[in-house]
């Protein structure tokens, strides 16, 4: 699936703004181990003009430079709009990182003891150090979840990529939990002695792509507004080395959402010309955005 990069003018609007104040742009997000995602976005000159006008009224030299008022105090109240923006950014960040990771398993780490989130993070860091010391190479994206009946209790949902015996993970998890109290253990503790559990759901290769996307959506839903409001910091912990490929953007000629979607599908080789239809799943939450998640099994046949 190769975009039509040779078409001139795709890096700038296809129509003059004074003639067409509503235009569309396609964003291509590639992943190294999963099919890409495509967003068709409406761009409004009127909204942009209002942004420039507001910046001018505030005496700013650019509409992209917000006045800096210093770092807000961690206990400073935040508006609902600010919390919702933070939540959306964090959810999107988690979903993209998990998709790029292409995990081989979804692992849930639980603790018998109730502990603050800071302590849980230290236990997790200790667990990761033990895994590295044992020569186990792995990558992850971890998101804490507040227990539904005990808000002070947390456990971790982890998108995991690597090869290891999961009994080793349980042993290292118990070692990290017990080390918090200065106790040294070298085996998996059972029954009432167990300080926590590790639940593993492996991803089957025959449905890997759909499972990866499902895990990405599942983990990102635990980025909640109350967690953002309470902790006011990063709400997920990715391992080093997970790098997102920079998104590519292409301006479209279509002047309606349906025209723009068809043009984007044709540009990226998703349109089935024989039946004049795109078999890919397209989600349109409103007139400003449309999302296309590519399923390779639904690509149109080669034209030869």
What are these model-derived regions, one by one?
Residues 156-158:
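Long, low-complexity, serine/threonine/proline-rich intrinsically disordered regulatory regions
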